[in-house]
């Protein structure tokens, strides 16, 4: 039976009705540990029906703020530059620019053109009342110049949106998935592939159309491509889907996922087992008209099982992971309305491995709300911004400063970078930093460029020298220790990777590696003669070397490949399993470090490459 989406879900219907009947107090329960956050004084506009995003737009070392939504009788979109504390108040200066004013909005920072700085995408309605006028605009920061509106970007106009970024087609640049509603009240899911020049190739007919919901992107099944989670209202009812990426096409995996709308989803490895778990919260029809629900799903080998953790659900708000207490694992913020006629709440749940999630701090609740963690004051811990409507007023913007006394150290950099190249594909892998055995409490952030230190192929949205990131959240490679790139052009590429802990603090980048793509070796009748006829390993280059050397080798047929390094005494000091590789020319790099990540001393080392039943070896000289 068709679902009457237009009748009950447009903002002048259910949304405004909800806004009238939310009358209970924003908070009432006691906390279970000393209060962690204090509200910071500021002069930012109070916002509801909008979004808040942290990002170092001007690359000066602190997080700026992008706000959009309803501000009193006004509609507002502004970028505020972080100027630090000014007496008793934190100062933000509004950036004069071409931003269009929207509500029922979503916005985000992303480096869409690979130039190393942050661009801005803003979607929403330019009109407060129905029929809504949907609008989507993309803005680019010109180097040393003003903010520029990019016309012809190719992303559809939508409102009541949510968005997520990631390299869906593995070509290096960042693509977009967006859910929302068009001006014609059609729920729509957009998959927009980045053309690399500020324009996108958008598809609206490949996935179920979703509105009034949320989307998240991540490698759920560990196969080195990005999958997605969709949740919200479709023309056929509420739904939540997990979609696996199979070579660019997406298929739903089985599971009894909750059918919710006005929903929020987030991916994160809360149990530290090396895969992405899922939290889903949103509204479902009940005796209370519309009631919030929440479920955490454990990822077990790419399949999802509901966890035993229990907490009140929310709708028209946000659930988000972040390590606010600096113990290494992911905690959870649950922020929104518990029911259509019910309390607005904002709870921080502390992740205690033995005791599950413990309600730790209670903040000012809200609805039509957004929230984001970020270290806006630069003291090394996660602060928090929330927006929405509360019982204290129709609009609010609260910034909470985290006053935890224990500040974590920056994570260590990854080591043992290896690039495996075949045809026009490259698999880049690394080893976790020293001291991260056991629970996996880091994600990884990769950069790839055509010049040393560059990021024009894969943008890390971070400073290549210090490693300081321009955005908050997990790294672009998530919890995996490898990424794959395809359709690479001939040439030499330079790459590195950094660790990102669950408080979103990043290490320096690892010692830079490089690899070379030398044209296609695809097998067909006319091209078979270009494939190697025998297994061969060539001398490393450079030799002697100080920081990194490359060993090239040929495979006449597909084989499982291993790379090992031995000292003069025959002790294995480094090993890497490169997986099954196709026939063709390949290379592997070594940075002079042990498996544990420590630098080895100067001297002569033996290397060996094994491929199936074949092996070959050589010597290399490391000079420190």
Predicted segment positions?
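C-terminal tail/sorting-segment detector
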Residues: 580-583, 589, 598-624
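Residue-level detector of functionally pivotal "anchor" positions at catalytic/ligand-binding pockets or at interdomain
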Residues: 403-416, 514-540, 556, 615, ...
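Glycine-centered coil/turn sites that cap beta-strands in beta-rich domains
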Residues: 427, 521-541, 545-566, 575, ...
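Beta-propeller blade termini
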Residues: 50-57, 105-114, 161-168, 213-220, ...
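Pro/Thr/Ser/Gly-rich low-complexity, intrinsically disordered linker/stalk tracts
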Residues: 405-439, 508-519
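Recognizes extended acidic, P/S/T-rich segments that occur
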Residues: 441-488
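Beta-strand-rich modules
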Residues: 485-505
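Blade-edge motifs of beta-propeller repeat domains
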Residues: 27-47, 81-102, 139-158, 193-210, ...
């Amino acid at each position: 039976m068709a679902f009457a989406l237009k009748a009950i879900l447009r903002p002048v219907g259910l949304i405004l009705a909800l806004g009238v009947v939310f009358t209970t107090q924003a908070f009432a329960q006691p906390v279970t540990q000393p209060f962690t956050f204090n509200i910071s004084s500021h002069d930012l506009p109070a916002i509801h029906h909008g979004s808040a995003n942290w990002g170092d737009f001007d690359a000066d070392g602190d997080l700026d703020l992008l706000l959009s939504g309803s501000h009193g009788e006004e509609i507002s979109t502004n970028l505020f530059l972080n100027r630090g504390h000014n007496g008793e108040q934190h100062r933000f200066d509004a950036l004069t620019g071409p931003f269009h004013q929207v509500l029922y909005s979503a916005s985000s920072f992303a480096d869409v053109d690979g130039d190393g700085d942050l661009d801005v995408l803003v979607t929403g309605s330019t009109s407060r009342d129905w029929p809504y006028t949907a609008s989507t605009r993309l803005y680019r920061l010109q180097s040393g110049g003003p903010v520029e509106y990019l016309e012809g970007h190719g992303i559809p106009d939508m409102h009541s949106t949510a968005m997520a970024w990631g390299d869906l087609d593995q070509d290096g640049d960042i693509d977009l998935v967006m859910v929302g509603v068009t001006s014609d009240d059609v729920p729509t899911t957009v998959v927009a592939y980045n053309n690399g020049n500020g324009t996108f190739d958008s598809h609206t007919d490949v996935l179920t159309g979703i509105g009034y919901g949320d989307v998240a992107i991540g490698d759920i099944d560990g196969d080195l491509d990005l999958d997605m989670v969709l949740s919200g209202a479709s023309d056929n009812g509420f739904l939540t889907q997990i979609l696996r990426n199979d070579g660019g096409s997406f298929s739903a995996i089985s599971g009894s996922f909750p059918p919710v709308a006005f929903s929020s989803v987030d991916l994160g490895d809360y149990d530290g087992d090396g895969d992405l778990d899922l939290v889903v919260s949103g509204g479902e029809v009940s005796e209370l008209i519309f009631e919030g629900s929440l479920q955490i799903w454990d990822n077990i080998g790419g399949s999802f099982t509901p966890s035993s953790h229990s907490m009140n659900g929310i709708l028209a708000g946000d659930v988000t992971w972040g390590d606010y207490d600096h113990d290494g694992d992911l905690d959870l913020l649950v922020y929104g309305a518990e029911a259509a006629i019910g309390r607005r709440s904002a709870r921080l749940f502390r992740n205690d491995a033995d005791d599950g999630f413990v309600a730790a701090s209670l903040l000012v609740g809200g609805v039509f709300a957004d929230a984001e963690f970020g270290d806006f004051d630069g003291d090394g811990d996660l602060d928090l911004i929330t927006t929405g409507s509360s019982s204290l007023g129709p609009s609010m913007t609260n910034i909470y400063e985290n006053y935890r006394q224990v500040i974590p150290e920056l994570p260590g950099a990854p080591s043992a970078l290896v690039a495996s190249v075949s045809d026009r594909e490259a698999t880049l892998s690394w080893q976790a930093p020293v001291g991260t055995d056991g629970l996996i409490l880091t994600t990884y952030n990769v950069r790839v460029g055509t010049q040393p230190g560059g990021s024009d192929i894969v943008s890390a949205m971070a400073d290549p020298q210090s490693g300081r990131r321009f955005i908050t959240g997990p790294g672009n490679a998530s919890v995996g220790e490898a990424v794959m790139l395809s359709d690479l052009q001939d040439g030499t590429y330079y790459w590195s990777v950094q660790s990102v802990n669950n408080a979103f603090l990043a290490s320096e980048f690892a010692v830079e590696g490089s690899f070379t793509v030398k044209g296609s070796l695809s097998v067909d009748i006319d091209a078979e003669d270009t494939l190697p006829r025998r297994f061969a390993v060539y001398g490393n280059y450079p030799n002697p070397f100080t920081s990194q050397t490359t060993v090239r080798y040929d495979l006449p047929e597909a084989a499982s490949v291993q790379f090992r390094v031995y000292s003069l005494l025959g002790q294995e000091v480094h090993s890497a399993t490169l997986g099954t590789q196709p026939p063709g020319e390949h290379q592997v790099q070594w940075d002079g470090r042990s498996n544990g990540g420590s630098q080895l001393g100067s001297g002569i080392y033996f290397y060996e490459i094994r491929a199936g039943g074949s092996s070959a070896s050589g010597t290399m000289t490391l000079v420190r």
